[in-house]
Amino acid sequence: MTSLSSNRIVPFVDIYFKIYFYGGLTFQLLLLTLILTKSPSILTNLKFFLINTCFLQIILISLGFFTQHRSLPNIDSFAVLPRGPCREFGPDVCFSAYHFFLGVALCVGLGISNTIIFRFQALRKGRVSRSRIFTMISLTYIPSSITIILPFTSSWDFEKVRSLTYIEHPKYDLSIYEPFVGFHNIASFQFTLATLLLVIGAYAIPAISGFLTSRVIHLINDNRGMSLKTKEQSKTLAYGLACQTFLPVICYIPVASCYIFSQMTSVELLLNEHLLGILICFPSFVDPFISFYFIVPYRQALLGLFKCRKTKPLNIVITVRHLSKRNPSIVDSN
């Protein structure tokens, strides 16, 4: 591999992140507007979870664009190659933003899973108090905060990272990323624990959410107090949350497995180096579309906005006029 070919994907990644940033923010802000203005009363409590997830995903999109990092594993170190606007503020800011990026990504996954847990508890108990809702949301920030804080308790030696990276990847042209950052010792307690939290989150969150989703659907089917329409809308929402939970599995597990393979064998996987950062935040770009489709009031609002949904006010007027001729008292009963 020549030094030139090692950066052949970079122009495409640059274009992607521009589309990702402006498109992602637009869709998330549209979703936030729908949550605030089109949520029916039945979604009043659920709205807190939706707003929380939307807010976190806006931050994640911003951090992904701010860093635009490429991940380059070494034998005993890990290089983070930023190409985003963070470079204007120096290596320390880029490395700090990278930690926040990982922490917020974990918090997004926990937030979506937390929404499913809330639906499960609401169906079982009938009502969840407002204080319990805020407690549930607050608890999801604990693992994420630990993931963010841990690296700041360890020493940073970017010069050593750069030296080791150039030695282990002599054919790579890394000048476009200078001065890049990273972990100089991946065997440290801080790096190991933070990585463990992220791995547990990637595997445990979908597993637990999948189980709870099946339980939620079972409870909805057994609920005799719900109308058929409410049951269908509730199940549709549950399916949407399940999609949001399992989307990260598709994005995370393949690239994470390739990263472990590259770390253990020292085999350079150029595409995976870029995809590791891209796919961690990619679900935040897609999630609004899942919400637009699976949350029925939002879908109806968008269809109404683009005039794709057939409205029935004319039919209602005709029916009322027809009935009024036969029985005027139906129209004016007072």
From Swiss-Prot:
Disulfide bonds: none annotated. It is a multi-pass membrane protein. It comes from the Eukaryota. GO terms for cellular component: membrane. Its main location: membrane. Gene3D superfamilies: Rhodopsin 7-helix transmembrane proteins. Pfam families: 7TM_GPCR_Srd. It is found in: Membrane. The chain crosses the membrane at residues 15-35, 46-66, 98-118, 133-153, 191-211, 241-261, 276-296. Keywords: Membrane, Transmembrane, Transmembrane helix. Belongs to the nematode receptor-like protein srd family. This is Serpentine receptor class delta-55. It comes from Caenorhabditis elegans.
